[in-house]
Amino acid sequence: YWNMQGSGKVKFDASAGFYDEWGDIPALEYKTKMNFIKIAKLKKGILYHLKIEQASDLKIPTKRLSLGYFYVQKNRIMRIWENNDYEAQGNVWTLSKKTLNRIIKTSEIPKYSTIVWQKKTYKDTLKHDKIDWHQYLKKIQDSPKKRLRYGGYYQYPQHSGYWETFIWEEGTGLIFYQSGYRDGVECIMLKRQGVKLPSDVWYD
């Protein structure tokens, strides 16, 4: 599911919408590249940092260009979380230099890290209105190839906050990514070029 053996770039079709200086959210479609940056070889796999390139016609906040750090192992992919402050982390998946150096030196992963791909799926175990980070990993039905979707969102008292989706395809790797707030505010959507997806791919 993870097709990169070293650092590299993969082409994606993208669309994004962010508030401009007039308070509007113009939608922009463009082409970009996903940077799979190899950080270190650990005991059970490789640590990568995923970043997308800045759009030329739209200023995407720098913190949203990073998808975070991923520990890629033979049987699973883990998203590295430094702590459990999901609300604060919502739109910036970064690691302190201290934590990153400790991971590289010891191969020990922070306990709050989460599995975004493995063969065994899982359901959200929290009550739907619980204020916390909700997540699941499920199979996508009626697909020509084996595909898995990871979804996560932060639940507030009256509505959901930040949310994101990853879709992985066997033999290809990451084919789709989307993140934003509530009803598509400050949204980024990425689709791997050459991959066909249904128009309603972001729905369950």
List each language-model region with its residue ranges.
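Conserved functional acidic sites
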Residues: 1-204
